[in-house]
């Protein structure tokens, strides 16, 4: 009887350790998901800014071309 109680305690300890580890991994996953969402938002914003800069540069180059043609 003593042996099976010891085995049960070891099993209980391993299960608790696994549960604790899973809880930590879930918290880490939640943090990574949140960080990923922030990075996706930042990426989207930077892409929009990049497009806006490209449009402004094209407009400026167009004006320079018009000036060159009128000279």
From Swiss-Prot:
Instruction: Say yes or no: keyword Lyase present.
Output: no
Q: What is this protein called?
A: Cell division protein ZapB
Q: Where, subcellularly, is it found?
A: Cytoplasm
Q: In this record, what's one Pfam family?
A: ZapB
Return the InterPro entries for the record: Cell_div_ZapB
Keyword annotations of the record: Cell cycle, Cell division, Coiled coil, Cytoplasm, Septation
What is said about its interaction partners and assembly? Answer: Homodimer. The ends of the coiled-coil dimer bind to each other, forming polymers. Interacts with FtsZ.
> What's the main place this protein lives?
cytoplasm
- Tell me the function of this protein: Non-essential, abundant cell division factor that is required for proper Z-ring formation. It is recruited early to the divisome by direct interaction with FtsZ, stimulating Z-ring assembly and thereby promoting cell division earlier in the cell cycle. Its recruitment to the Z-ring requires functional FtsA or ZipA.
Q: Name one GO cellular component term.
A: cytoplasm
Tell me its family.
Belongs to the ZapB family.
Q: Which gene encodes it?
A: zapB
Name the species this protein comes from.
Aeromonas hydrophila subsp. hydrophila (strain ATCC 7966 / DSM 30187 / BCRC 13018 / CCUG 14551 / JCM 1027 / KCTC 2358 / NCIMB 9240 / NCTC 8049)
The record, for Gene3D superfamilies, names:
1.20.5.340
**Residues in coiled coil:** 5-67
Look up the record and give one Gene Ontology term from the biological process aspect: division septum assembly
């Amino acid at each position: 009887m003593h042996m099976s109680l010891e085995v049960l305690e070891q099993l209980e300890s391993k299960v608790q350790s696994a549960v604790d580890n899973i809880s930590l991994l879930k918290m880490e996953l939640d943090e990574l998901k949140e960080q990923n969402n922030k990075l996706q938002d930042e990426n989207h914003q930077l892409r929009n800014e990049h497009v806006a800069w490209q449009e402004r540069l094209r407009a400026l180059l167009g004006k320079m071309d018009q000036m060159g043609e009128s000279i």
